[in-house]
From Swiss-Prot:
Induction, as annotated: Constitutively expressed.
Disulfide bond annotation, renumbered to this chain: none
Protein name in the entry: Superoxide dismutase [Mn] 1
Enzyme class label: oxidoreductase
Organism, as annotated: Leptolyngbya boryana (Plectonema boryanum)
Oligomer status and interactors: Homodimer.
Lineage: Bacteria, Bacillati, Cyanobacteriota, Cyanophyceae, Leptolyngbyales
GN (gene name): sodA1
Purpose: Destroys superoxide anion radicals which are normally produced within the cells and which are toxic to biological systems.
Cofactor requirements of the protein: Mn(2+)
GO MF annotations in UniProt: metal ion binding; superoxide dismutase activity
Length: 248
């Protein structure tokens, strides 16, 4: 009798243990954070491209993508870490926070944080709002907002391309949103980000018009690069950023 009872008890415990660990596993999944953190400054890190170097062919060539990400973007990240070595308090902040509060950054390193922090934030967004087999017309809330603001997608593209073409030297063309969802087009020099000068101008789309972004394929034909770039815009990612802008 005791032997039978012992066997039943062992069988019962054997059934309960896997169930217990399964419940623990599920609770851990449910507790996982859903929001992506801002870019860390302790240390700053270069994430891999979300697609292959050749994935944006024929509009952006693989060699340009490799050099742009692995050399140019990597240099911005390395420079941030080198600059902040002597500033442990600043390492506790995100790179996003540093570039939006440049007046609080020590003057001795302010320009370096502006240039390299901006370069890191700008390029991180740039890789995310492009994708293979993307392009086409906008979708979702962004499509409606573009039509309401600019009249049509074609009119918007014309104004955006002009902002990129007219930017003398190096810089960026941007589509920004305020917290109410109002859109506007702007451009910045060098690696400046719109949030550096206007905390209510959240970038949801940006095109890099530095020569390193296009010169290997397009040489001095920036206008052609600007036109072809629309074939790789990831409108799903742009819509996500548009929603984020209104939650700021």
């Amino acid at each position: 009798m005791q032997t039978t009872f012992r066997r039943i008890l062992i069988l019962f415990v054997g059934l309960l243990v896997p169930l217990f660990f399964a419940c623990q596993s599920n609770s851990q999944v449910d507790a996982a954070p859903s929001a992506a953190p801002q870019l860390s400054a302790s240390p700053a890190k270069l994430d891999p491209l979300p697609y292959d170097y050749a994935a944006l062919e024929p509009y952006i060539d693989a060699q340009t993508m490799r050099l742009h990400h692995d050399k140019h973007h990597a240099t911005y990240v390395n420079n941030i870490n080198e600059t902040l070595k002597a500033y442990p308090d600043l390492q506790k902040q995100s790179v996003d926070s540093l570039i939006q509060n440049l007046n609080q950054v020590p003057e001795a390193i302010r320009t370096k944080i502006r240039n390299n922090g901006g370069g890191h934030v700008n390029h991180t967004m740039f890789w995310q709002i492009m994708a293979p087999k993307a392009g086409g017309t906008p979708t979702g809330a962004v499509a409606k907002a573009i039509d309401q603001t600019f009249g049509s997608f074609d009119a918007f593209k014309q104004q955006f391309n002009k902002a990129g073409a007219d930017r003398f030297g190096s810089g960026w063309a941007w589509l920004v949103s305020d917290r109410q969802g109002k859109l506007s087009i702007t451009s910045t020099a060098n690696q400046d980000n719109p949030l550096m000068s206007n905390p209510n101008a959240y970038p949801i789309l940006g095109n890099d018009v530095w020569e390193h972004a296009y010169y290997l394929k397009y040489q001095n034909r920036r206008a052609e690069y600007l036109t072809n770039w629309w074939n790789v815009v990831n409108w799903q990612a742009v819509n996500q950023r548009y929603a984020q802008a209104q939650r700021k």
